[in-house]
Amino acid sequence: MQKLFRAIPAIDKLIKSPQGVDLIERFGHQAFVQEARALIENAREQIIKQQCLPAFMNEQSAIFSLIEQNLQKKRMVSSKTVFNLTGTVLHTNLGRGLWSENAITAATNAMRNNVALEFDIDEGKRSHRDIYISQLIQQLTGAEAACVVNNNAAAVLLMLATFAQGKEVIVSRGELVEIGGAFRIPDIMAQAGCKLVEVGTTNRTHLWDYRNAINENTAFLMKVHTSNYHVQGFTKSVSEEELVELAKEFDLPVISDLGSGSLTDMAVLGLPAEPMVQQKVAAGVDLVSFSCDKLLGGPQAGIIVGKKVLIDALQSHPLKRVLRCDKVILSALEATLRHYLFPEKLTDEVPTFQLLTQSIETLQNKAERLKAVLNKRLDSRYILQVEPSLAQIGSGSLPTETLASVAVTVFAEKQSDLLELEKRFKALPSPIIGRFAQQKFWLDVRSAAQFEQLLNMLEEA
């Protein structure tokens, strides 16, 4: 066994060899030494367990080849680009929607240059970082003022912490939502230091339920848009308009968490309707919060719009600094919002709407092209077809609504062959992510952004 151990090269010898010098120049001394030590430790363990030298230790070139492979893997960016063919357009686990070219340009410009982030150029003095984008948001929503934080959950937390710490918040039991990752409205309330008061039942809540719960310790009445589920059947809910009238009697504010949020009429685009921010503002809701990286089609952020006196209080709360956005996100968000000044161009300029509004004819053509490329790459174990599919918006938006779509389906007699194919797709330079259903592997083209790049990659694979 000692003879086997002596066959393992010393770290110093590997460092001084020509191959070692080359790898150190490319990857750095520390990284090279770490990988070399790991490889040597692996060899020692195999000698102890199996009384034999690993095959790669027989040739020095094989040792350096393995070190280089491991260094290359670790150098790769962990957030790899992927092709989304799941049929879920705004797939949370795949980064949701793509930014528009204008948003990318604005973000890149902010990265490369100083910007007037908290500086009033006209007055020549310090300002707050939301001031410029607030003016645009006010124009789009009709609100008195606006505040931007890093996501909608942060927006809800900030509103609760500012106005309800140590007080009670009244919410319908049917609106106590849980979003991805077991993140619940009651948990946010507990974190903000306020008490949740549930009213009504899961399926029915009346105006008098709210009225009966109001007392001297009530901070505000809250509406939560159930964007990721829908209760049907024997149901009753209270509208924002009704809640606003009730709140006025007790001089209380009404706060609405819209979740996905929309600044355009989805029905006009031929898509399922979703509550619009402007509608809630017009209904008299005091504060409305919504996401920016879902239906809005922008970067991850959360916007709060509403009464100026309330927004001013949010801006001055210490938590606002913790939750604020940087210059890159604010620049990208402003560029995204400017698209909404010209709603007739949304389907041409915002990738989210480009994907959602594709015609069946366009999708059929894409699916046929994808099938043709795959047919040239897959063997006889796989049967490919172009089939109708049902896509969805995703990210908790309109959970009960589907979009007609088209997919390439792959069938194999053996399930193991389909699993092997999925593994092959995931091993591509930019992995292809599909879904399993009905004993087939589905590649839904509605959610496939950068479609030409996808075909080119498959042609070259």
From Swiss-Prot:
InterPro entries attached to this UniProt entry: PyrdxlP-dep_Trfase, PyrdxlP-dep_Trfase_major, SelA-like, SelA_trans, SelA_trans_N_dom
Keywords: Cytoplasm, Protein biosynthesis, Pyridoxal phosphate, Selenium, Transferase
Reactions catalysed: L-seryl-tRNA(Sec) + selenophosphate + H(+) = L-selenocysteinyl-tRNA(Sec) + phosphate
Required co-factors: pyridoxal 5'-phosphate
Modified residues (N6-(pyridoxal phosphate)lysine): 294
Pathway of action: Aminoacyl-tRNA biosynthesis; selenocysteinyl-tRNA(Sec) biosynthesis; selenocysteinyl-tRNA(Sec) from L-seryl-tRNA(Sec) (bacterial route): step 1/1
Location(s), subcellular: Cytoplasm
Gene Ontology annotations of biological process type: conversion of seryl-tRNAsec to selenocys-tRNAsec; selenocysteine incorporation
UniProt EC number: 2.9.1.1
GO molecular function per UniProt: L-seryl-tRNA(Sec) selenium transferase activity
Gene Ontology CC terms: cytoplasm
Family: Belongs to the SelA family.
Primary role: Converts seryl-tRNA(Sec) to selenocysteinyl-tRNA(Sec) required for selenoprotein biosynthesis.
Annotated protein name in UniProt: L-seryl-tRNA(Sec) selenium transferase
Organism: Actinobacillus pleuropneumoniae serotype 7 (strain AP76)
